[in-house]
């Protein structure tokens, strides 16, 4: 675990009960918010007390995926702007037992670019929520605000669809998150500068991989390498392949796990996949949550399997 000077914890603190999950994706349009809503519903159906947080600051739409007729009057923006003091006070009922929603902060300009002290306050209060699972739906891309939400999670999940752009962006997200985590663990400015330089593929230090980075740090500060290795070992993202249309799409998750091990030196897990079904999007247009409408459908069953795999930290067998 490490903390920045501003007080932001960049790795999760062990808990006996509550878990923070985050659902990210390197690009938009991959069904991430709908998957977050579906997972939240499934977890609540399993008896978990769940708060969904729409952390797509500036582009909140999780309320629509849940079938709410209108955006909630109270949002994360009210907490950020200190209109309320407790983050619990902006959590609203969804109509599903055990599932509440903290809607995103798209109700004021600049929500996506909150200041560092505001971010620290939000993240630290999220850690104190009294529920079984906090499930955060993150925005797309690799902005630091998005990555910092991902890094405080106990379970960080990357959603991909079986398309080259989505796969490339997911890999880029994981690499950026890893380097952001390592920078948070660095204790000297020289080491921080080396890590920051590594984000530029054309950096003067010739750093292309985390192994190159560790070698560069060892030359500068040999005593810092062990702590960075521990951070790398503790970083464990999960992958979910969404909108699967055929058997050939399923191995994409295994390919990402292999790429992370080979090129980034980290352990990751392929947690599961969800098939595409046009009926899902028809439900969205009618403001209905598909998994609640058709719990016996293939996508709903796969979401249930995914929830169990994430709870148990299980990986999809290579035979898939």
Regions found by a protein language model. Give the residues of each.
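Inter-motif core of Ras-like GTPase G domains
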Residues: 127, 145-165
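P-loop/Walker-type NTP enzyme "switch/lid" segment
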Residues: 55-132, 188, 196-208, 218-222, ...
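Walker A/P-loop NTP-binding active-site region of P-loop NTPases
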Residues: 19-87, 133, 146
